[in-house]
Amino acid sequence: DVQAVSRDTRRFSSADGFNLAASGDNTAASAVLRALGRNILTYDPPEHGDFKRILMPAFMPARLRILEDRIRTFVAELLKSLDGRTEVEFVSEVASAVPIRALCELLGVPAEDEPKILAWTNRMVGAEDPDMSVNIIEAQQAFLEVFAYGKWLVEKRRTEPRDDLMSLIAHGTLAGEPLSDATRDGMCA
């Protein structure tokens, strides 16, 4: 069923973009929708494949082995830092630290910025969690902040490329031409 839907872009197109719940202040929702613009999630084949090819080097086996080694090292160091402790706040000290590190490694986010990424992430998903006191407006604002950060990081990678996803976006091309600012921005969303 999933394969059939993914191949039937006439009836199940991604081109309509996102239907963002705009409870509360519609201004924030409108800003988020403008920031999302056209991005890899809103393209159908064959355009979707063109964007996917830009990002694929980050997901090749050799690159993923490097990422895996870095994450294993991080987890080993993290567990060593907890050794001998009688109590651990598992969610904040382990369960959230590991995926944020993996995401930041993949994207190329400097380690010193990981706390910001975690805070934005918690605010973005917190509106859906009854245990967190985040409203939809705060979640939308967090999205705009992380989007601005992503645009900043891509711009930085244009002059300081590294072996990361944001550098692939910064230097990506379509049909032999550099990505437009709007396209790069959409890929940050």
Regions found by a protein language model. Give the residues of each.
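Active-site substrate-recognition loop segments, prototypically the cytochrome P450 B′-helix/B-C loop
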Residues: 1-91, 100-118, 122-132, 136-141, ...
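Short, well-structured alpha-helical segments
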Residues: 72-75, 118, 166-167, 181-188
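Central I-helix of cytochrome P450 enzymes
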Residues: 96, 100-105, 146, 173-189
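Cytochrome P450 catalytic core segment centered on helix I
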Residues: 119-181
